Amino acid sequence: MTNIRKTHPLLKIINHSFIDLPAPSNISAWWNFGSLLGLCLIIQILTGLFLAMHYTSDTSTAFSSVTHICRDVNNGWLIRYLHANGASMFFICLFTHVGRGIYYGSYLFLETWNIGIILLFAVMATAFMGYVLPWGQMSFWGATVITNLLSAIPYIGTTLVEWIWGGFSVDKATLTRFFAFHFILPFIVAALTMVHLLFLHETGSNNPSGLNSDADKIPFHPYYTVKDLLGVLMLLLFLLLLTLFSPDLLGDPDNYIPANPLNTPPHIKPEWYFLFAYAILRSIPNKLGGVLALVFSILILAAFPLLHMSHQRSLMFRPLSQCMFWILVADLFTLTWIGGQPVEHPFIIIGQLASILYFTIILVLMPVSSMIENRLLKW
């Protein structure tokens, strides 16, 4: 008798995706982050669901409802901080996952890569709207500053901003719609994740060498289920350590002050995972230019397949390109640091130089170093 998992219409899909899936025998721990992102999404949806049961999306009660969750709801403080720090873990996994894709040339799976970019935008939008919901000072002013950027769009900008706000400023209508979008987007992300996996399983996984691994495959279960389990336990350990020992480490103290439209905080800044893009935005004195740089700082990921000049897929055997990659990583850390600093000397010039370097490495230095490597190998 054939095993039910191989014949049942639903179980068959799960079987082909997570059990009998042929996987390369040499994929490293950098391939764990896909499953960790799935876990993060599940944690966020579950904690978010329980938070939504107690939250009210009204400007007069939003801040109080979050306080009520932390003080009066059974383990409400834990759910709230798991959700807030779960977002940080989500982005750590996201950035690592994208970095892995760049390092090992996984971007050559075009459909998978492009769906991944859409997923990145969707998760960033979700996180931004979630940050507005507690209705603290940084929530309110963050929402005001970021939505206001759309007014830089010629001709329709101002109308567009007022349409998103639902009025002439960030107010009750804005909070209500942000809550609605924040609730629905994770489910859209989950659906897109399935499409992401569907396209990945059309080609099979890449591997560190970047070579074809058809001749050497192993079943996903038990080898990679057990390997993923180790990643899961480590992620949960870090998340719980962060949540239980220093839950506010990555947050902003200003968000414990209720939103006040009459009082601007001295330094408006987003959560840490947006700081690199925020630094690029601030480094350009022109408003429209800044907005375009902000969008292209993420959208530039779509250019990676077009800029792939090397005859090898992975960076594993390409020391020059490896140097460029790690300079890019260091540059992103620099941008993240600058994004959290006030707009004054020397931070302005450091931010501008780091922004120029970011685009230069991706658009010029990485393709050029690939071509130099090709020449050195006489290809």
From Swiss-Prot:
GO function terms (MF aspect): metal ion binding; ubiquinol-cytochrome-c reductase activity
Matching Pfam families: Cytochrom_B_C (PF00032), Cytochrome_B (PF00033)
Keyword terms of this UniProt record: Electron transport, Heme, Iron, Membrane, Metal-binding, Mitochondrion, Mitochondrion inner membrane, Respiratory chain, Transmembrane, Transmembrane helix, Transport, Ubiquinone
Residues that span the membrane, as ranges: 33-53, 77-98, 113-133, 178-198, 226-246, 288-308, 320-340, 347-367
Annotated heme b b562 binding sites: 83, 182
InterPro entries: Cyt_b/b6_C, Cyt_b/b6_C_sf, Cyt_b/b6_N, Cytb/b6-like_sf, Cytochrome_b, Cytochrome_b_C_euk/bac, Cytochrome_b_N_euk/bac, Di-haem_cyt_TM
BP GO terms, sorted: mitochondrial electron transport, ubiquinol to cytochrome c
Known cofactor(s): heme b
Keyword Electron transport listed: yes
UniProt binding sites for a ubiquinone: 201
Sites where the protein binds heme b b566: 97, 196
Subcellular location per the Swiss-Prot or TrEMBL entry: Mitochondrion inner membrane
Membrane topology summary: Multi-pass membrane protein
Cofactor binding notes: Binds 2 heme b groups non-covalently.
Gene Ontology cellular component terms for the protein in this record: mitochondrial inner membrane; respiratory chain complex III
Subunit composition and interactions: The cytochrome bc1 complex contains 11 subunits: 3 respiratory subunits (MT-CYB, CYC1 and UQCRFS1), 2 core proteins (UQCRC1 and UQCRC2) and 6 low-molecular weight proteins (UQCRH/QCR6, UQCRB/QCR7, UQCRQ/QCR8, UQCR10/QCR9, UQCR11/QCR10 and a cleavage product of UQCRFS1). This cytochrome bc1 complex then forms a dimer.
Function: Component of the ubiquinol-cytochrome c reductase complex (complex III or cytochrome b-c1 complex) that is part of the mitochondrial respiratory chain. The b-c1 complex mediates electron transfer from ubiquinol to cytochrome c. Contributes to the generation of a proton gradient across the mitochondrial membrane that is then used for ATP synthesis.
Name of this protein: Cytochrome b
Protein species of origin: Chrysochloris asiatica (Cape golden mole)
This protein's encoding gene: MT-CYB
